[in-house]
Amino acid sequence: MKKMNNRWQSVLLSLALFGLAACTGDFEDINRNTNQVTDDQMDALNYKTGTKFKALQSLVIPVQEHMYQFNESLSGGPFGGYIGATVDTWQTKFETYNPSADWRKWPFANVITETYTPYKGIVNGTEDEVAIAFARLLRVAIMHRVTDSYGPIPYSKLESNESVYVEYDSQEAVYTKMFEELDEAIEILGRNTTLPAEAWSRYDGVYYGNIAQWLKYANSLKLRMAMRLSYVKSDVARAKAAEAIAGGVIEANADNAAMHAAENRTTLIYNDWGDHRVGADILCYMNGYKDPRMEKMFLANDVGDYVGIRIGIDVTSKSQAMSKYSNMIVASDTPYLWFNAAEATFLHAEYELRWGSAETAKTLYEQAVRLSFEERGASGADAYLVDATKKPAPYTDPLGNYSASARSEITVPWETATDGSDTEAVQERNLERIIVQKWIAIFPLGVEAWSEHRRTGYPKLLPVPTDKSGGSVNVEQGARRLPYPVEEYQQNNANLQAAIQTLGAEQQNGDRSGDVMGTRVWWDCKPYNK
């Protein structure tokens, strides 16, 4: 932060000296405050647009600690099998399907409000096509997480309205619009890959102005979103995924998308406050596989074991939970992961499994695992990929209250069909392998893990022991979405009621209805039983 301040002090001094040297102009120029940067000077430095660009980047994976906690640690993280709460005074929480009114607003209203001020400032305040492309891309990166969490959301009407209390779009309409915006951004970025990095570097905490890398991220995001539609709109999913792959996705860890903030504030959440510990689910899988990445990602508990907290329990002692369950490894200089090469390669593997070559799918699957090992600095990927004996471990609660048998018997090595009769079953098991390994590789992206769990049914997760939903959630299937904030009922009720009707109309293969956590969103339609 001090470096940035010094840089701007130099800029301001230069501009002030420039103003003093040019004081022979008209009266306005003579009387201008020479220590103040003008609009023209800020435009020349890309300052006004650049600061809004930084603001949008800070929301893709929220860097503000409270916003991060509500979006990832308290909702997406638990539902994705990554994180469980240790606080013994939280009796109303997402994990037990009874979040308080205050909790419900954070992943929805707070994200939307924070996004649209800088977004509109760019699209309405500049004619720079690259800046507008960045704004469109980042809005999609932020808002696809919101629609994936809720279903129908306000989207198309927000750009032209001052109020955030507007009509909702169906999730299908949101995805359609987002693909249009991604395609527009990809086309513009593709024409500007030789733009000097200096044009954006001071405002870019991800790729430091490298447009070619941003293009890979945009195509990777398109691939993620395309595969999200694999069950609800298979033809669209296949076409959009093919376009993304052809356009060039992230294939090397050097191109991973991660936000380098001045400080990673999740250290407060996990290290200082101790409000959360690693979830039992991910450590059951990794313990069972004797996964070498485990010690690179997590800390052992007070007796040297890697063991997670069961998600959705009634915690009786925070201090005991903090010591008995493993924490994640995070430091103040840890970047906020957005998208890594392993995820893009696993998505490509699934594309090949569904619509291409099974042999290519196998190659990509193994390549993705190796990329993840490389990213974590772990060795032993080759041995890991051929060990057909190890399976996910049962859960043994160090406090003795919530132990459970393993939910899956999936092994790591790719499986080849031995005859035509078992092709479909083998393909499904290989899909489970892809999703489980991707789940391990993208930690701690909780919202994404939860979305893929809902889409595919994998990884198979432990049910919550404490269900306070009043029957509005099928505990075996887990939470399918988040409920809308109370403020929407109070300030935007007519539009909200229409959205709830749309939510129900879009649902397929669901067994709950209405604005509850058990209702399925549009793309969550796989008819599976856990």
Where are these regions (language model features)?
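Sec-dependent bacterial lipoprotein signal peptides
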Residues: 1-21
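Membrane-proximal, proline-rich intrinsically disordered regions
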Residues: 23-81, 110, 125, 459, ...
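Short capping/connector residues at structural and topological boundaries
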Residues: 35, 42, 158-160, 255, ...
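Beta-strand acidic-aromatic groove motif in beta-rich domains, primarily in extracellular
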Residues: 65-74, 152-153, 238, 451
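Short coil/turn segments at secondary-structure boundaries
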Residues: 68-72, 298-300, 446-455
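Structured, solvent-exposed acidic/aromatic patches
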Residues: 82-138, 142-383, 420-432, 437, ...
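C-terminal functional modules
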Residues: 386-530
